[in-house]
Regions:
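Short hydrophobic/aromatic beta-strand or adjacent loop that forms the aromatic wall/cage
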Residues: 57, 147-151
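Conserved acetyl-CoA-binding loop-helix of GNAT-fold acetyltransferases
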Residues: 94, 100-113, 140
Length: 152
């Protein structure tokens, strides 16, 4: 598996394969715990394996000094509203001890670049309203929230 260099020589990005399904599930559970929603994570390793092997979802991992410390789960979407494709980030997590080192910013910059390379016009994700530190992070990288709708 190819490791993609970043501006931090100790931090590399790599795409997951279906064989990484267990690690993806582990990170989804970490995210669920952080979001106080672990009981909502009902995915199984087999389900994640299927999503990855059928190219219905993708994952990038962030490895720091060879150890996985971050992940993003995403998939392609489209909008009749703008008549364009995009990328939707369904899960994003950086290990707590690795936050505030610029790694999340590197991961999101990679996602923006990937979207452009794939001809997508936007990258979207959700963020829980109570998660003020994440809201600050997203605003700091230039993201603009949509506060005129509720997702059901």
């Amino acid at each position: 598996m190819e490791k993609i260099k970043t501006k931090d020589p100790r931090f590399m990005i790599r795409f997951a394969t279906s064989e990484d399904a267990g690690l993806v599930l582990e990170y989804m559970r970490k995210l669920g715990t952080y979001q106080k929603m672990l009981d909502k994570i009902t995915a199984t390793e087999e389900g994640i394996y299927k999503l990855l092997s059928e190219n219905k979802g993708e994952v990038i991992f962030g490895d720091y000094d060879g150890e996985t410390v971050a992940f993003i789960y995403f998939f392609n979407n489209s909008s009749a509203f703008i008549g364009q494709t995009g990328i939707y980030i369904d899960g994003f997590f950086v290990e707590e001890n690795m936050r505030f080192k610029g790694l999340g910013k590197i991961m999101m910059a990679f996602m923006s670049k990937l979207a452009i390379e794939r001809g997508c016009k936007r990258v979207e994700w959700g963020c829980l309203d109570w998660n003020e530190s994440s809201v600050r992070f997203y605003k700091n990288i230039g993201a603009v929230g949509v506060d005129t709708m509720t997702i059901y």
